[in-house]
Design a protein with these regions (language model features):
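Short, low-complexity, polar/charged sequence segments that are solvent-exposed and flexible
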Residues: 7-8, 30-33, 52-56, 97-100, ...
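Cap/lid and interdomain-hinge subdomains that line or gate substrate/regulatory clefts
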Residues: 21-85
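Solvent-exposed alpha-helices and their adjacent loops that cap or buttress functional pockets
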Residues: 3-6, 25-28, 68-75, 96, ...
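Short, acidic/small-residue loops that bind anionic groups at enzyme active sites
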Residues: 2-27, 33-41, 103-109
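Short acidic, glycine/serine/threonine-rich loops at helix termini
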Residues: 2-3, 21-27, 45-48, 89-94, ...
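Glycine-rich phosphate/diphosphate-binding loop of Rossmann-like nucleotide-binding domains
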Residues: 75-111, 115, 119-123
Length: 125
């Protein structure tokens, strides 16, 4: 699933979604929607069927929306990492850049955000 392009609808239903640190291994730097099943995926119980029905409806909703294309004008785009203690400064920098015609895309500076930023730059997004 991670090899599918950014913006392509992806849903992963997992009973392990709430295990600390494990979801990072599933998602890594992709835009996968992680849907916690709460109940174990073993036999089609009424509760599991409800979870799978809702996951299917979520996917159907995503498929009804317009396909998102990367920005046509990437020449004026700037990727910027942001972190809570520096948010005020980052916001001021973002506003100044936007006033000068740049499109600023913010990424969280910890965890997978920095790697996601590098990956998206490599993909030309």
């Amino acid at each position: 699933m991670r090899s599918l392009p950014f913006g392509f609808p992806k849903i992963l239903v997992s009973s392990a979604a709430a295990i600390p640190g494990l979801s990072t291994r599933f998602i890594q730097t992709s835009d996968i929607l992680l849907f916690h099943s709460v109940v174990e995926i073993a036999g089609l119980t009424g509760l599991l069927k409800n979870v799978l029905d809702r996951a299917g409806l979520a996917m159907a909703g995503m498929l009804q929306g317009p396909a998102t294309e990367p920005s046509a004008d990437r020449s004026r785009a700037i990727a910027m990492t942001m972190l809570s203690p520096c948010e005020r400064c980052a916001r001021m920098v973002r506003v100044a850049l936007e006033k000068n015609g740049y499109s600023v895309v913010g990424f969280h500076a910890t965890g997978m955000g920095d790697r996601a930023m590098e990956g998206m730059i490599s993909e030309g997004l």
